[in-house]
Each structure stands twice: as structure tokens, then as C-alpha cells.
Amino acid sequence: MESTQQMASSIINTSFEAAVVAATSTLELMGIQYDYNEVYTRVKSKFDYIMDDSGVKNNLLGKAATIDQALNGKFGSAVRNRNWMADTRTTARLDEDVNKLRMMLSSKGIDQKMRVLNACFSVKRVPGKSSSIIKCTRLMRDKIERGEVEVDDSFVEEKMEVDTIDWKSRYEQLEKRFESLKQRVNEKYTSWVQKAKKVNENMYSLQNVISQQQSQIADLQHYCNKLEVDLQNKISSLVSSVEWYMKSMELPGEIKTDIEQQLNSIDVINPINAIDDFESLIRNIILDYDRIFLMFKGLMRQCNYEYTYE
């Protein structure tokens, strides 16, 4: 189990977030414009440096690890820490650290009065109220028991100079900024809605055009299919008619068979191929007619006959 270590890490992370919020809130109250990412980066760098350089982070995580080990039944580390804390050298070192911290606080302008007051009193905020409760710490109770607390009756109320803040003007400025931001957001939203409507209208019109074109394509396809069927029927009837007409004529059987084979070779299914077949058949008929004419012409000359066209 590492629940205590996780809790300590969570407390450290929460402290960092609180430091960021405190920094940004202070800048906002002072009316200073800032970049959140820059503030976040600077606070994180300083916070990590202080926590690492001072050893506070490692100290907290180490104590949390010791508690987790004790909870898991491993008391060796806890016993060593207890012996270390009870050692006189450790106590002397802690006194030195406390004295160093006091001198550091004094150098930062935090005098003894402020340190004592902060150690003796704490403020408890009342939820939902502007007032607060001042609580005495255990140190204050010990001082009262030891008689180290006195009441100063010669206290003279001095007029404190307080910097007044015009909250009304501040509120009006914030309200103007909010209205300006709201107007810009509304303008962007309105323009986006108009663009979306235009895109939808274009899409609907395009869909209508596509539907109309698909309908026209379907009509043309139906018309083409009908034409193809009509041509197939026409070609089939033409072949049958020519075949019947040929059989009714007094032609030799070989010629009828040849013409019948050519008629049967016509592609009735595909009109384009049928036209090519008809062209070939007509060419053959013309060629046969030309040959017959030449034979007849030669025969007339051999018989000393002449021919004329009327």
C-alpha cells in the first residue's frame, strides 16, 4: 500500500495549484495583465526548486513511505526514525535549523511580533458569512496558563489609512469587458451559423441537382433500353421477312442456302453488330449482282447483241 505517499504527493500538487491560483488572483486584483502559461511556468519552476532545494518534498515523501511501511507491518524504518528523532545530535541540529529559519524570516521583514501572532492565533472563516472566527492555538493557551498574556489598557485607537477601492467602477469595467466579450462571441456564433446555413443550402441544392440528374439518367437508360428492344425486334422481323421473301423466289438451292446462312449469322441481340452484318450482306449481294451483270454483258457481246439503259 502506498496510500500515504499518494496522499502526500496529492497535497504537494494541490499546494502548487494553490500557489498558481494565488499568484493569478493577486495579479488580477492589481489590474496587471498577464499570460497564464508564463505565470504557470514561472511558479512551477520556483516551486519545484524550493521544494527540492529545501528538502521538504523528500522529507514529506520519506515520512509517508515510513508510515506506509509501518501500516504494512514493517516497523524497522519507523524505529530508526524514532531513535533518530530522540538523539541529542538530531535535536541540536533541529534547533540550528529553527534558528536559521528565524533569521531568514527576520531578513525578509517578518519580525518577532508577526511570528508570535501567527503562532498564537488562527482565523476560521464562516461559510456563507463575511465575518470570521479568531481561534487561539495551543501555544496561546500555554502562554495564558503561564501568565505570559497581558491586557494593555492604554491602547489608543489610531486611524488607519486604508486604500479604498472603487468597487463600482471596477464592476463597471468588468461588466463592459464581459459585454464586449459576449458581443464578440455572439458575432462569431452568428457568422458560424450563417456559414453553416449556407453550407446546408448548397448541400441541399447539390442533392437536388444530383437527384434530378439521376432521374434524367434513369429516363435515358429506360429510353435506350426501349430503343434497343425495338431495334432487336425490327432486325429480327427484317431477317424473317427477307428469309421468307427469299424462299418464295425461284432461286437455286445453293444460292438460297448461302443467303440463309448469311441471314442466320446476323447478330440480332446487338444492333451495332447487326448493322455491320447487314452491311456485309448488302456488299455481297451487290458484288454478286455486279458479277452477273458482267457475265450477261460478255454473253451479249459474244452473241453480237447490244444493250442500252432506259
UniProtKB/Swiss-Prot annotation:
Q: Where in the cell is it found?
A: Host cytoplasm
Residues annotated as coiled-coil are 163-234
Record keywords: Signal included? Answer: no
User: Which stretches does the entry tag as region Dimerization?
Assistant: 147-203
Task: Report the InterPro entries cross-referenced here.
Answer: NSP3_N_rotavirus (IPR042519), NSP3_sf (IPR036082), Rotavirus_NSP3 (IPR002873)
The record's SUPFAM superfamilies line, in alphabetical order, gives: NSP3 homodimer (SSF69903), Rotavirus nonstructural proteins (SSF58030)
Q: Which GO terms describe its biological process?
A: regulation of translation
Specify where the region named Interaction with host ZC3H7B lies, as residue ranges: 167-231
Assigned keywords, A-Z:
Coiled coil, Host cytoplasm, Host-virus interaction, RNA-binding, Translation regulation
Q: What family does the Swiss-Prot or TrEMBL record give for this protein? A: Belongs to the rotavirus NSP3 family.
Identify the HAMAP family for this entry: ROTA_A_NSP3, ROTA_NSP3
Q: What protein name does the entry list?
A: Non-structural protein 3
Q: Which organism is it from?
A: Rotavirus A (isolate RVA/Human/United Kingdom/A64/1987/G10P11[14])
User: What are the top taxonomic ranks of the organism?
Assistant: Viruses, Riboviria, Orthornavirae, Duplornaviricota, Resentoviricetes
